Amino acid sequence: MAEYNKVILMGNLTRDPDLRYTPAGLAVCEFPLAVHYRYRAHEEAKEDVCFINVVAFGRVAERSKERLRKGSCVLVDGRLSQRRWETPEGQKRSKYEVVANSVHFIDGGSGVVPGQEEDLPI
């Protein structure tokens, strides 16, 4: 059975990105994205907002931290991932997030932060 996991989102950061490093030294950057959806219902304009957490690794993470700020408009190309963990009390938790392969800066930036496997100039 063929499988396909691709997500493309455009939205605005709701806060500045957080950058941290794993014990192995891998950069990890997380930022929440507000994605708006506009539609009409019964001749009335409506809007929904979806808040999605995005996580980037390596070079994409470091460049995202350097260039992004709250309010930045970005286009994210990535995949949907489910993170699972257990609390100290033994409760199982999970959350969905988008793992970014690349982040395109729409306003105030130039270029793309490519995925780790790519070697494109910025």
PLM regions: where:
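Residue-level recognition of specific faces of alpha-helices
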Residues: 3-6, 30-32, 51-53, 77, ...
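Short aromatic-glycine-enriched beta-strand elements
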Residues: 21-34, 94
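Acidic, gly/ser/pro-rich intrinsically disordered tails
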Residues: 1-4, 18-24, 40-47, 62, ...
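Disulfide-stabilized netrin-like
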Residues: 45-59
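Beta-rich strand-turn-strand
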Residues: 57-93, 106-107
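Structural detector for short beta-strands of small beta-barrel domains
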Residues: 8-16
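Conserved positions in beta-strands of structured domains
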Residues: 14, 20, 57, 81, ...
